[in-house]
Design a protein with these regions (language model features):
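Active-site-adjacent core segments of small-molecule enzymes
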Residues: 1-219
């Protein structure tokens, strides 16, 4: 029930290596410059004085990053506290460059749309749920998968030609901006289904390291 971005990541095992698609349940992020990431993390961490997260530290940093406003509207809307892991979307956030053996490339975004719909809790609902079950997100996912109610997400891609980059009134490569679907259409390419729990928790969960830099030829 914590109001916070929730991760959404997948590991693809291919014949040419492993590709980690690391993202969030929101289509954008707080910052657009990677060099700001350490400062962002420091602001989010507990205060070194009392070891408690300090909202002043968080918003002192974010107030200096006006492009974070888009992300904040997601976090402080109902999507900031999803009703369940099943009822949230997933996004790769960044625009990836996909290229062929001729060196030709397109920019692509990966969007996972929940087939269960997207639902969130308001402040009152979140407080009530936390009082009943602090682990309700995990419990909900576990119970539904074990009951055979497998959650599914349709995978859509958005494809942009490099020659079109300058035809927008914003930078399409800025991760704090979305690609409106009326400007860059989504195309369905598959469906993700969670059809079982990990059989070996240590091997399949604790040892899984997801790194944005893990790419494969063509991406």
């Amino acid at each position: 029930t914590l109001r916070d971005p929730h991760g959404f990541a997948l590991k693809f095992y291919t014949q040419e290596g492993n590709w980690d698609l690391v993202g969030n349940q929101t289509p954008v992020f707080f910052i657009k410059d990677a060099i700001k990431f350490p400062d962002f993390i420091h602001a989010m961490k507990p205060s070194p004085i009392n070891n408690v997260q300090d909202a002043n530290r968080v918003f002192d940093f974010l107030s200096s990053q006006p492009w974070a406003t888009n992300m904040l509207t997601y976090v402080y809307g109902n999507q900031g506290v999803p009703t369940s892991y099943r009822e949230q979307d997933g996004f790769g956030v960044h625009a990836f460059k996909l290229y062929n053996d001729k060196g030709e490339y397109k920019y692509v975004k990966f969007n996972f749309r929940s087939k269960q719909g997207v639902k969130g809790l308001n402040v009152k609902q979140a407080a009530e749920q936390q009082a009943k079950d602090f682990n309700h997100l995990t419990n909900d996912l576990y119970k539904n998968i074990n009951a055979g109610n497998f959650p599914k997400w349709d995978l859509y891609i958005q494809v942009m030609d490099p020659k079109d980059l300058n035809s927008f009134d914003f930078d399409p490569l800025d991760p704090t901006k979305i690609w409106p679907t009326d400007l860059v259409k989504e195309t369905k390419v598959g469906t993700l289904t969670l059809n079982r729990m990990p059989k070996n928790f240590f091997q399949e969960t604790e040892q899984v390291a997801l790194a944005p830099g893990n790419l494969v030829p063509g991406i």
